[in-house]
Amino acid sequence: MGKPIVAIVGRPNVGKSTLFNKLAGKRIAIVEDTPGVTRDRIYAQAEWLNHNFTIIDTGGIEPESEDIIVAQMRRQAEMAIEMADVIMFIVDGKEGLTPADNEVALMLRKSKKPIVLVVNKIDRIEEEDNMYEFYNLGIGEPTTISASQALGLGDMLDKIVENFPKGYQDEEEDEYIRIAFVGKPNVGKSSLINKILGEERNIVSNIPGTTRDAIDSFLERDEDKFILIDTAGLRRRSKVKDQIERYSTVRTYAAIDRADVCILLIDAEEGISEQDKKIIGYAHELNKALMVVVNKWDLIEKETNTMNRFKKELQSELSFMSYAPYIFISAKTGQRVGKVLDLAKECYTNYSKRISTGVLNDVISKAVMMKEPPIVAMNRLKIYYVTQVATKAPTFVFFVNDPRTLHFSYERYLENQLRQSFDFTGTGIKMEFRERKE
C-alpha cells in the first residue's frame, strides 16, 4: 500500500487552494477569486505527526453547471475522490450553507469514503457558532479552521490521520521492483508493457488494479519480481485547456509516487513535450530512478548518426537528469524491447546501491588530493570524512569544517568523482554537507 491520499473537495471559492498551499508548506498553486482558476500543481506531499501522505486539490465542484470546463472539472474531481483514502470537504463559514454544499455532500456520501467536514474562513473566535448550520449536511461534526491564518489546522489534521487505513505504516517493503511507465497518451505505454509481458514466460498475474492505480501487471523473471504500472488510463477527453489541463497528470503522479523506477516513454516522431518534462521532473524531485525509452524508432528514417543526434537533443531538453540512460525501441516490431527490463533493473540496482564508508573515504581523499577545494570567503573547505546514510536514492553526508565554504563547482566535482568511481547510472545522488568541529 502506498502513502494515503487525501482529496480536498468543495464548491468553488471556499479556500481549497489556500489550505492546499498551507499543508504543502509552499505556494505551489495560483490562488484567485475566479471559480475554475488555473493552477500549476494539484498534487503534493504533506506530513503530520510522522504520517506522510499525499494531498490532491480537486478544484471547485459546481453540481448544476452545464459549462463544459466546469463539467470536466467535476468529472476530474470525482476521479480524485475515487482515488482518495480520506476526503476533506471544505465549506465557507462566512457565506454559510448553500444548496451547492448539499449537492456536493450528497455526491461525497455515495463514495462511502471517510469524510472530514472542514468549515473554513473562521478567522475569529466569535465566528465559531457559524459551524452549527453545517450539521445539516449529515456528514458529522464540523472542524473549524482559518486556512489563510493557519488557525485550527492541527485539530483538522488529527482527524485526517485518524481516518487513514489501518496498518498502512506497518507493511514491510516487499521484494517487487515497481516500474511506472509515464508519457503522453498514444506514445505506446500499453503496447510496450504488453510486449514485455508477452515475451516473458513466468507471468504471475495480470490484474486490474484499484481505481487509484490504473493497471498493475505482476511479473517474475529469473530471480526478479516486477510490478509494471501502466498509466495508460490517462486520456485528455476534451480539447478544452487551461483549467482542466492540470488534471491530466493526477494518476501519473500517483503512479510515480509508488514507483522505484520511472520510465519516460517518448514518441520518436513527436519528440518531447513540456508535459513530459513536468512529469519526469516530478519524479526527479522525488529522487526516483529514471530512464528514457524512445518508442516508434522503426518509423524514423535513419542515417549513421541519427540516434546520437536524437539522444543529444533529448539530453539537452532533460539536462536536469543527465544521469538517465536512453534506449531506442519499437514496441510494435519488438526491437530492443527485451532490453528495457534489463536497463530498468540496472537503474534499480544503482538506486539501491550502498558503498562502504572505507571505500567511500578512499575515493574522496584521492579526489581532494587531485583537486583542492577553492578558497571561499578567506577560508578553504576541509572534508573530515563522508558516509552514506541512505539508499533509494543514494545519500551521502560530508562532515566538513564549514559548509558555507563549499563552492557549487566543487560540489559538482565531488559528485562527478563519485559517479566515475561507482556506477550510478539511472539514479540521482544526494549530498549533504554538515559542520563538524575538528
Curated annotation (Swiss-Prot):
CDD domains: EngA1, EngA2
Domain KH-like: 353-437
Record-level GO BP terms: ribosome biogenesis
Binding sites annotated in the UniProt record for GTP 1: 10-17, 57-61, 120-123
Amino-acid positions noted as binding GTP 2 in the UniProt annotation, renumbered to this chain: 183-190, 230-234, 295-298
Gene3D superfamilies with a match to the protein in the record: 3.30.300.20, P-loop containing nucleotide triphosphate hydrolases (3.40.50.300)
Domain EngA-type G: 4-168, 177-352
Protein keywords: GTP-binding, Nucleotide-binding, Repeat, Ribosome biogenesis
Function: GTPase that plays an essential role in the late steps of ribosome biogenesis.
Family statement drawn from the similarity comment of this UniProt entry: Belongs to the TRAFAC class TrmE-Era-EngA-EngB-Septin-like GTPase superfamily. EngA (Der) GTPase family.
Name of protein: GTPase Der
Organism of provenance: Clostridium tetani (strain Massachusetts / E88)
Gene name tied to this protein: der
